[in-house]
A protein has these predicted regions:
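Glycine- and aromatic-enriched mobile tails/lids
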Residues: 1-11, 27, 40-42, 50-56, ...
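N-terminal Rossmann-like FAD-binding beta1-loop-alpha1 element of flavoenzymes
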Residues: 11-35
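Short hydrophobic core segments
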Residues: 13-15, 184-193
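Conserved N-terminal glycine-rich FAD pyrophosphate-binding loop of Rossmann-like flavoproteins
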Residues: 39-72, 76, 242-245
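Short beta-strand to alpha-helix junction loop
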Residues: 79-92, 126-144, 155, 203-211, ...
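Conserved redox-cofactor binding core of oxidoreductases
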Residues: 99-180, 192, 201, 236-238, ...
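FAD-site-proximal beta/loop scaffold in flavoenzymes
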Residues: 162-172, 176-178, 323-367
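An anion/pyrophosphate-binding glycine-rich loop and adjacent beta-alpha core
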Residues: 216, 222-330, 382, 391-393, ...
Length: 513
């Protein structure tokens, strides 16, 4: 029997303590909220691990219109224009709010913000905090601010397991703790659970991030969008470390070059060269590796002895792997870094389920389209966290009726899913691989064991990917290498995806026979 935490009834429940979750809670204050986090506050979040900064058009030669144009170009036809225009327009205000919360951004000698350059940006507009340690330097003061705010309660070591419904409305959240399961009664829940990198062997995300928020929302009947678009960062440090360490795009922004084992600069003739959009660079590196080669970043001439001063975190990670980036080539490979798909929301973070908001990487707002522009993720997390808070503040708490019964849920474990997703749902895809993934994932989902929730999320990626018969953005198919003339986003519910998956099983068995 689960304990109902009646003393917390009526509080807004926020699941996750990355940038999106923290900004939601701080913006809602003094409205009573409770943050549910499986780890320590702000810990084990992609936000805290971010090396890149926040994209904001703060330079004299820049504008929101230019930032929007770069965002749309990277998004490859699938961006929601209204959402993208409004988010980039609010970037400067988000920087101001973060500074007000205690974040100290890097400045130049004149006292103005230092602006970095990253791939597919036409201007220097990346705002950093403590260089390539931006994520931690942003999350730390926000977590401190949350700890100082009396209206925010934090439940650490608490794993969200199921959303509870009263009809089709949110009624509460079932969570697992060391002491057993508990229920938080609430008609207003925000999911800020991060991405899906933990579904893959090679990822830069915390390994526990397997798309829990997507699984929660999907089981509650929420609309999902663009699940097929998984961004592989081109330059993860190729080492034995797990998760893989990131070698930020900013290193290429400062002039580092990509070369293969023959010292050939294979990106030289590509539009944008080393600073082409991430999907383009990831595919090029994957092709080099697929032919049996290796790929390296060469920062020796561009940075040399200045590398450690510019990128202290990356320098330390390289040295941990036995590489001196001032003298040595840095071995790199693509790794899952960001998910453009997720729970479909409007411009305020509202999902299709009444009482449920989703912000940050767990959401699919349409900002990123088919391929995220570098450093737009922290921007979206900050802006959408604030927006959702303002939207929620206008919604009165209702007395939802908790269901009498709820299924027993076991702790999730994505280990059985990782080899399937890594093999079949990688940088390059085809029909046989995707149907193979569906055939392997359905039994794990139906088994209702530890792999069920991770399998659900991977299954959604496979189904969405199988339906997109083109190559666009981060979704590249060897059997459909061309882009269709008309770009179209796709949404569906879990029930729809399961119907499609079950109908695909005979095909996959026939292919493997």
């Amino acid at each position: 029997m689960s304990e109902i935490l009646a003393d917390l009834s009526g509080r807004i429940v926020i699941v996750g303590s990355g940038l999106a979750g923290l900004m939601t809670a701080l913006t809602l204050a003094p409205e009573p909220t409770v943050i549910v986090t499986r780890a320590a506050l702000g810990g084990e979040t992609s936000s805290a691990w971010a090396q890149g900064g926040i994209a904001a058009s703060m330079g004299n030669d820049d504008s929101a219109a230019l930032h929007l144009a770069d965002t749309l170009a990277a998004g490859d036809g699938l961006c929601n224009l209204k959402v993208a225009a409004s988010v980039v327009a609010e970037a400067s205000a988000a920087i101001v709010e973060l500074e007000r919360a205690g974040v100290q951004f890097d400045c130049n000698g004149a006292g103005a913000l230092s602006l970095g350059l990253e791939a597919a940006h036409s201007r220097r507009r990346i705002v950093h905090a403590k260089g390539d340690g931006s994520g931690a330097a942003i999350i730390r003061p926000l977590a401190d601010a949350v700890a100082r705010t009396p209206s925010i309660m934090v439940l650490e070591g608490c794993q969200a397991q199921r959303l509870l419904l009263d009809g089709d409305h949110i009624a509460g959240l079932l969570c697992a703790t060391e002491m057993g399961t508990v229920i938080l009664p609430s008609s207003r829940v925000v999911l800020a659970t991060g991405g899906i990198g933990g579904l893959y062997d090679a990822t830069t995300n915390p390994v526990g991030n397997f798309g829990q928020g997507i699984a929660l929302a999907a089981r509650a009947g929420a609309l999902l969008a663009d699940m097929e678009f998984v961004q592989f960062h081109p330059t993860a440090l190729d080492s034995r470390r797990r998760p893989l360490a990131l070698v930020s795009e900013a290193v290429r922004g400062e002039g580092a070059l990509l070369v293969n084992e023959k010292s050939e600069r294979f990106m030289a003739e590509v539009d944008g060269a080393e600073l082409a959009p991430r999907d383009v660079v990831a595919r090029a590196i994957s092709a080099e590796i697929a032919r049996g080669g290796r790929v390296f970043l060469d920062a020796r001439q561009a940075l040399g002895s200045r590398f450690a001063a510019h990128f202290p975190v990356i320098d330390a990670l390289c040295r941990e792997a036995g590489v001196d980036p001032s003298r040595d080539l840095i071995p790199v490979r693509p790794a899952v870094h960001y998910h453009m798909g997720g729970v479909a929301t409007d411009e305020n973070g509202r999902s299709s389920v009444p009482g449920l908001w989703v912000v940050g990487e767990a959401a699919s707002t349409g900002l990123h389209g088919a391929n995220r522009l570098a450093s737009n993720s922290l921007l979206e997390a900050a802006v959408m966290g604030m927006r959702a808070a303002h939207d929620i503040a206008g919604v009165d708490a209702s007395r939802a009726k908790l269901p009498h019964d709820h299924a027993r849920v076991v702790a999730p474990d994505p280990s059985l899913v990782r080899p399937i997703a890594s093999r079949h749902l990688g940088v390059l895809r085809n029909a046989g691989a995707m149907h193979g993934a569906i055939a392997a994932l359905l039994p794990l989902f139906d088994g209702d064991g530890p792999a069920a929730d991770p399998a659900l999320v991977a299954l959604l990626i496979a189904v969405f990917a199988s339906l997109r018969t083109e190559s666009r953005g981060a979704h590249a198919r060897t059997d459909f290498p061309l882009k269709l003339p008309h770009a179209q986003r796709r949404t569906m519910r879990l029930s729809d995806a399961l119907d499609i998956a079950r109908s695909a099983i005979p095909y996959s068995f026939a292919r493997s026979a």
